[in-house]
Curated annotation (Swiss-Prot):
This is Chaperonin GroEL. It catalyses: ATP + H2O + a folded polypeptide = ADP + phosphate + an unfolded polypeptide. The keyword Transmembrane helix does not apply. Forms a cylinder of 14 subunits composed of two heptameric rings stacked back-to-back. Interacts with the co-chaperonin GroES. The lineage of its organism: Bacteria, Pseudomonadati, Pseudomonadota, Gammaproteobacteria, Aeromonadales. The keyword RNA-binding does not apply. GO terms for molecular function: ATP binding; ATP-dependent protein folding chaperone; isomerase activity; unfolded protein binding. One of its GO terms (cellular component) is cytoplasm. It comes from Aeromonas hydrophila subsp. hydrophila (strain ATCC 7966 / DSM 30187 / BCRC 13018 / CCUG 14551 / JCM 1027 / KCTC 2358 / NCIMB 9240 / NCTC 8049). NCBIfam families: GroEL, PRK00013.1, PRK12849.1, PRK12850.1, PRK12851.1.
């Protein structure tokens, strides 16, 4: 086992504090509408320019092991805030730095660290309750646009785009962010259910000008196996031909004789048919076939439940108003499934989202909910260069998370004002002893830090503006973008309650642990063994 270095008391805490301050100072320059960018060097490709707190925090690794421990703990604050609300990472870092700095001063002055932590925890619990009391529901598209604008660094176009996307696909719809082709941002909305499988043969195409298959009022046959024998399908094909409707087959695969016969039937105009592979793989494919069945009012023909393709009837087939199949995608528009069954399926998938621990699974389940419940919107981010594209994409992503958080828990006045108002309301809060009272004061003083940092980044005098805001009431605050005082809600400066709450809770949690640290242990750097000496020439080997 490697030898360890051990530091105690003030020596340990001062090293830890240095690390905290290095990381927090790098992150906090990005806060507010006039926050600056940070350039991150990459071992390959061009440097990345970002204004996203958590991206900056993740890049920081310090050489000194003890300083690095402090930095890594604050990095955890930013990471947790990002996971919980998707935004507010810089605010969380600024709060953590303020609590640690004030708290360690109190410890150095002889206060009991455990009582300080209890005081901080007490203040945070009370502050969260006050924040929720101040919170207002994010009712309309205008409020959603304002939240998105603030989170995207005062970019109004981004805010409006997100509000428009939410309006079109609903609050539960999936909104994804992708690289655009041009300089402008675009919004593409896919109505109905779309999955990433295209037609199995180009001979199915009936709209040559668009290269797509478009079928109106079709039957939908869902099969959970490979289909290669046409005899199995004859009863269904005959029934569909008599009904005079088109047919789309969604199966694990359609190949050989079966595919050839379908193509011939289509080209001769006997039956309009198209075949596509079922989306997903394994268990996910089975689940998605079931989703399509519920959406279209059909039944999945599966041998696992004792159903055979030869015995399938028209009653087993799903229906939809229209289906469009391109080379890459299939879109089912207006399935005729029972609304109550669709709702219960959505509720079931939501339950799975709550229970899953995998981010990948959660994302896929959310996509399934959106496909059943509304649709999918894609925001295509435009930029002149790849570096700008990455930076802008990160901002749009943040704004998207912030708007979702706002819809979930409502909004409070932005610009650090909500925390200042909460601190003022809790001025009379008391702990069980004097040390706890100091802990409460540490937390309440730290709640002013985000406002002060926003003002500092705007190049103004923090103390003057902080006092002016503290002397005001309600939503009165300072708009650093326009350099004016006024009602923050009226000026459209809103923060999601969830983002502010998460930032405060995670910051106080980690900062409290750091204040109560008394000893730090780190591995000593390994000393390299000295190199072998040069052998030189071997003696005594003269010529005979």
């Amino acid at each position: 086992m490697a030898a360890k270095e051990v530091k105690f008391g003030n020596e340990a805490r001062s090293k830890m504090l240095e690390g905290v301050n290095i990381l927090a100072d790098a992150v906090k320059v990005t806060l507010g509408p006039k926050g600056r960018n940070v350039v991150l060097d990459k071992s390959f490709g061009a440097p990345t320019i970002t204004k996203d707190g958590v991206s900056v925090a993740r890049e920081i690794e310090l050489e000194d092991k003890f300083m690095n421990m402090g930095a890594q703990m604050v990095k955890e604050v930013a990471s947790k805030a990002n996971d919980a609300a998707g935004d507010g990472t810089t605010t969380a870092t600024v709060l953590a730095q303020a609590i640690v700095n004030e708290g360690l001063k109190a410890v150095a002055a002889g206060m009991n660290p455990m009582d300080l932590k209890r005081g901080i925890d007490k203040a945070v619990v009370a502050a969260v309750a006050e924040l929720q009391a101040l919170s207002q529901p994010c009712a309309d598209n205008n409020a959603i646009a304002q939240v998105g604008t603030i989170s995207a660094n005062s970019d109004e176009k981004v805010g409006k785009l997100i509000a428009e996307a939410m309006d079109k696909v609903g609050r539960d719809g999936v909104i994804t962010v992708e690289d655009g082709q041009g300089l402008d941002d675009e919004l593409a909305v896919v109505e109905g259910m779309q999955f990433d499988r295209g037609y199995l043969s180009p001979y199915f195409v009936n709209k040559p000008e668009t290269g797509a298959v478009e079928l109106d009022d079709p039957f939908i046959l869902l099969v959970d196996k490979k289909v290669s024998n046409i005899r199995e399908m004859l009863p269904v094909l005959e029934g569909v031909a008599k009904a005079g409707k088109p047919l789309i087959i969604v199966a694990e695969d359609v190949e050989g004789e079966a595919l050839a016969t379908l193509v011939v039937n289509t080209m001769r105009g006997i039956v309009k048919v198209a075949a596509v592979k079922a989306p997903g793989f394994g268990d996910r494919r089975k689940a998605m076939l079931q989703d399509i069945a519920i959406l279209t009012g059909g039944t999945v023909i599966s041998e696992e439940v004792g159903m055979e393709l030869e015995k399938a009837t028209l009653e087993d087939l799903g229906r939809a108003k229209r289906i469009v199949i391109t080379k890459e995608n299939t879109t089912i528009i207006d399935g005729v499934g029972d609304a109550s069954l669709i709702e219960s399926r959505v509720a079931q998938i939501r339950q799975q989202i709550e229970e899953t621990s995998s981010d990948y699974d959660r994302e896929k389940l959310q996509e399934r909910v959106a496909k059943l419940a509304g649709g999918v919107a894609v925001i295509k981010v435009g930029a002149a260069t790849e570096v700008e594209m990455k930076e802008k994409k990160a901002r749009v992503d943040d704004a998207l998370h912030a708007t979702r958080a706002a819809v979930e828990e409502g909004v409070v006045a932005g610009g650090g004002v909500a925390l200042v108002r909460v601190a003022a309301k809790l001025a009379g809060l008391r702990g069980d002893n004097e040390d706890q009272n100091v802990g409460i004061k540490v937390a309440l003083r730290a709640m002013e830090a985000p406002l002060r940092q926003i003002v500092i980044n705007a190049g103004e005098e923090a103390s003057v503006i902080a006092n002016a805001v503290k002397n005001g009431e309600g939503n009165f605050g300072y708009n650093a973008y326009t350099e004016q005082y006024g009602d923050m809600l009226a000026m459209g400066i809103l923060d999601p309650t969830k983002v502010t709450r998460s930032a405060l809770q995670f910051a106080s949690s980690i900062a409290g642990l750091m204040i109560t640290t008394e000893c730090m242990i780190s591995e000593l750097p390994k000393k390299d063994a000295p190199a072998m000496p040069d052998m030189g020439g071997m003696g005594g080997m003269g010529m005979m």
